[in-house]
């Protein structure tokens, strides 16, 4: 199915929607003929607006295709800062978070997540040659280095939990600002998802990817689509459709351009487990 994915400025997308079978504010919007608003930031590979202004990235692709399998194609992308995604969902500025958000216990208090759609570790970007030998959170802690990461990223909480001082955690809006801080010497390392780190390292000669094999095991996480707690009925239907789609040849062909491979499938891990253990 060919699905248009234009930004808000292009207007509402006219399409048919599924018969009302769920309860909750999202289903109320669907019943009223309104769009399903998907919220995401500008995160390479995961969820971002491409040069044509369309919703792109593998988490957007998965969410949109699952919705389509439910008969729902009236989708309206909403782009914002990463740190505003959960507040925006709760304030009903959009209906789903499709930016590739990790399932964390602290987030599960505010968001109802779908079953996982991907697994990924954290990655570290350093200056070319890695002069400080930084390959893990522990290296940042022991060397009292300055790390830069995104405001609202899981990496902030991870660093704090390990004992890295807040003064050594620089928070910026996103990947572009992280690279700028690293290049300017304001930070010794940039910490973000391994997906993003690999993508950025390939685009900038002045920086490189640290040795991901040295990253702590607890930094491996699972991403899912975020819903409001009030939309549990719709979420159950989404999960049923997701189960039929995840890992299929159709899906893997769709997301291959975003470097998603079988290694990134979540396996048997459930959102319930991730909420309790991450």
Residue ranges and their predicted role:
Residues 84, 100-109, 160-161, 188-219:
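A ligand-binding cleft/hinge motif common to bilobed small-molecule-binding domains
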Residues 75-87, 132-135, 169-184:
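Short helix-initiation/N-cap motifs at beta->coil->alpha
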